Amino acid sequence: MKLLASTVLVGAAAASITPQQQVLQNPFKSATKPVSDAWSKSMESLGHLTGSMKGMTAEAKAIWDEVSMLFPEAMEKAAFFSEPKPHTRKPDSTWDYIVKGADIQSVWVENSKGEKEREIDGKLEQYNLRAKKVDPSKLGVDTVKQYSGYLDDEEDDKHLFYWFFESRNDPKNDPVVLWLNGGPGCSSLTGLFLELGPSSIDKNLKLHNNPYSWNANASVIFLDQPVNVGYSYSGSSVSNTVAAGKDVYALLTLFFKQFPEYAKQDFHIAGESYAGHYIPVFTSEILSHKKRNINLKSVLIGNGLTDGLTQYEHYRPMACGDGGWPAVLGASECQAMDNALPRCQSLIQNCYDSESVWSCVPASIYCNNAMMGPYQRTGQNVYDVRGKCEDTSNLCYSALGWISEFLNKADVQKELGVEVSSYDSCNFDINRNFLFQGDWMKPFHRLVPGILEQIPVLIYAGDADFICNWLGNQAWTDALEWPGKKDFNAAKTKDLQLESGHKTGTFKSSGNFTFARIFGAGHMVPMDQPEASLDFLNKWLNDYTL
């Protein structure tokens, strides 16, 4: 669903935005124990990673010291891996389709030089894909053809759940879109029912048709990833974006092999929030395979976290009235954020330079506390500056609880072929694991220039979001170093509008790069502005212009 507000490292579900979350009141100002004691204890609990200390500065070491002193219980729980979800694997005979990666790898063809080579690139032998036909009349989510199932990594005991909806229009010719929610650790099925899918769910668990569903003119795959998110499960774990990318490439390859009727259409990846990390990595992984059956044409990132060094500078302006909405914070809090920014940027730069867990984790901890903490303590919704957080047990949105109730119904799980015992919209252990692997602050924006050389990229942002705000997204797209930077920065901003002439935002575009600001939308643009989001999606899928 969204970027979880992990403002501290967290010993439990502190990645959520509940009042009980331990946000440092004065980040890293005081110490009550000798540094050597703190360092010794933190190293004892994290000793299995001492080989990764390359690039760690004294400043980063000091952050680890201070965190271990302030939150000793959190350090003890920094295990980096989530607990396996209870599950029962169904016999192969219960599935309508099974495609084996080993069978794909066994197909060899002759190239133009007369040499033998594999028809499709990639290490796929350990993967299988299971699929079943979903009876639309059983669930009532949509009337279109649907498939659900799992991608299985038999070697590492990982099982990713997906749910596919055909286009409502012309599935034989309409494009296919993979949708990814963020977190990290939030299920893409929340995107299905809360934002852009065929139906929404009310408090009585009744379904309501969404006339602005993104499958109006495209087939859509909703994927629960990484493992142990949503209906996905594993005996092992994934705690970094790069590892997750291998799984996504395998899923798409096997899916399009099983269902070749969708493989010839244009394919696009879209997502929001932490998908600002996922999508550059997943896209680069796909594009690295020259012999593939994935017809990737473009990517879309909504309110993403992609370049922390640039984006974190814009938390203070967004919270203090410079983002087009009234200020949430007072002058003293705004000044404190300004004062903390140089240290935050220094830590992030060190992370960028070394990409070491020992440098990237302190950057995340310090900057999240200093830049998100003051806003979070007000009780305002971090996903929408226009209001308070109304339901702290469900990341401010009660509908998340309704979605979880619906997806925990036995008849729903049976029809979808679900193999886990329960569904949660977000797995906070996954969020913690990615944080402790240093994944949060890594410079994945550096992959974007290589992507732009091959396919178009759309960065869009609802302008009422705080946590991945439009100011920061606009700034990193302007700052990105790529051959088209000069022309992109000089491009004129144009109005984004519906056919009726109603203005829904602004955008600028040059070459393969487009940035769009969506008016009156928070973190989840399709939820807040459903008509506008479907309109710009259809325009983009048609010819990559808005």
From Swiss-Prot:
Enzyme class: hydrolase
Leader sequence segment: 1-17
Location relative to the cell: Vacuole
Catalytic activities: Release of a C-terminal amino acid with broad specificity
Glycosylation sites: 217, 512
Domain of life: Eukaryota
UniProt-listed Enzyme Commission number(s): 3.4.16.5
Residues annotated as catalytic: 273, 465, 523
SUPFAM superfamilies reported in the protein's UniProt record: alpha/beta-Hydrolases
Alphabetical UniProt keywords: Carboxypeptidase, Disulfide bond, Glycoprotein, Hydrolase, Protease, Signal, Vacuole, Zymogen
Pfam families, sorted: Carbpep_Y_N (PF05388), Peptidase_S10 (PF00450)
Propeptide feature ranges: 18-132
Purpose: Vacuolar carboxypeptidase involved in degradation of small peptides. Digests preferentially peptides containing an aliphatic or hydrophobic residue in P1' position, as well as methionine, leucine or phenylalanine in P1 position of ester substrate.
Protein name: Carboxypeptidase Y homolog A
Species: Botryotinia fuckeliana (strain B05.10)
Gene: CPYA
